[in-house]
Amino acid sequence: MSLYIGLMSGTSMDGIDAALLELPSNQLIHGITKQYSDDVRRNLDNLIMGNHLTLASICQLNTLIGREFAEAVRQLLIEIKVHPKEIQAIGSHGQTVCHDTSGSIPYTLQLGCGHTISSLTGITVVADFRTRDLVNGGQGAPFAPLYHQQIFSKVNESVAVVNIGGIANVTFIAKNQMTRGWDIGPGNCLMDAWIYKNKGALFDKSGVWASQGEVIHPLLEYLLQDPFFHLDSPKSIGKEYFSLSWLQKHLKPDYTPADIQATLLALTAHTIAETILNESGEIKQLYLCGGGAHNTHLKENLARLLPGIAVKSIVELGISPDYLEAMMFAWLAAQTINQIPVNLTSITGAKSIAILGAVYPIIKSY
């Protein structure tokens, strides 16, 4: 038995998920979510929205996020009463602030200094996972299908898993076939940004506000014309693309805020449903994970758009939808520490298998 910690802050930027994972059983021992401090959250919002931040402030933010990730580890270990020396390594995703693979020089950047996390926790850290995939010819995202493949390793039927974070991504798993996956488009990011702008709330709990509005069909049809939705896989996208500025250029003064929220939920539902339906009727089970798995109204919309397909939360398999990605980075850290390459060729389009991440070791005293 080996213990690893995974740290994840996704494109929703709603906090840091920390998961203690036992391997090789893939059992979640404990998980917590630590909210970002107000200063860090504000600076991240400004950075993602393209507001001016100095190079010095971005460098400071890298260290501050590292400190917050380390504090999440400290809180996790205190709650579960585990000593840092019992942990083999931490897998830290960091906080994505930009990700764009559309140009001749693809790039991705996750903040959260690995040296800071390692120094403050006394635990070896593996971080900067996505860059290795980019230089290997991949999209750098999504990685979730790798871990979904582990969970459904004994699958006897075709299933789809959709992770609804800030960006939604899909995994298709079938017996005796290569696992495939890619980014679909906006998951929660536009709904979160819109409700924050209008109501000051971080997210639309259960989709209640969206359920009070009416879908603006001309707006929905216009949004669905965005070129990203029509790209072939593999493909990936960042939250900075599907931003409020992307949305606001399509809005008209007579649109009500609640109706816009309803339309944004419909956009997420329609793009997910179309992705599933394009699998030619093979899929009979759709499992949802990520924060969007708690959105009752979104789940109802998906069930309506996908007749004949059972739409479920991954919690029905005894797996936490909130900590699945953090668990994945704990698992990825174990692969890196043990020099085990992973295969993203059918997911991100990588040219070959690769060992992901950079290792930030500690010096152990004996």
UniProtKB/Swiss-Prot annotation:
Binding-site residues, ATP: G10, T11, S12, M13, D14, G15, I16, D17
Pathway(s) per entry: Amino-sugar metabolism; 1,6-anhydro-N-acetylmuramate degradation; Cell wall biogenesis; peptidoglycan recycling
Cysteine pairings via disulfide bonds: none
Pfam assignment, any one: AnmK
Enzyme class: transferase
Catalytic reaction annotation: 1,6-anhydro-N-acetyl-beta-muramate + ATP + H2O = N-acetyl-D-muramate 6-phosphate + ADP + H(+)
Matches recorded under InterPro entries: Anhydro_N_Ac-Mur_kinase, ATPase_NBD
Domain of life: Bacteria
Gene3D superfamilies: 3.30.420.40
Keywords: ATP-binding, Carbohydrate metabolism, Kinase, Nucleotide-binding, Transferase
GO molecular function: ATP binding; kinase activity; phosphotransferase activity, alcohol group as acceptor
Protein's GO biological process: 1,6-anhydro-N-acetyl-beta-muramic acid catabolic process; amino sugar metabolic process; peptidoglycan turnover
PANTHER family to which the protein is assigned, alphabetical: ANHYDRO-N-ACETYLMURAMIC ACID KINASE
Family statement drawn from the similarity comment of this UniProt entry: Belongs to the anhydro-N-acetylmuramic acid kinase family.
Protein role: Catalyzes the specific phosphorylation of 1,6-anhydro-N-acetylmuramic acid (anhMurNAc) with the simultaneous cleavage of the 1,6-anhydro ring, generating MurNAc-6-P. Is required for the utilization of anhMurNAc either imported from the medium or derived from its own cell wall murein, and thus plays a role in cell wall recycling.
Stated name of the protein: Anhydro-N-acetylmuramic acid kinase
Upper lineage: Bacteria, Pseudomonadati, Pseudomonadota, Gammaproteobacteria, Legionellales
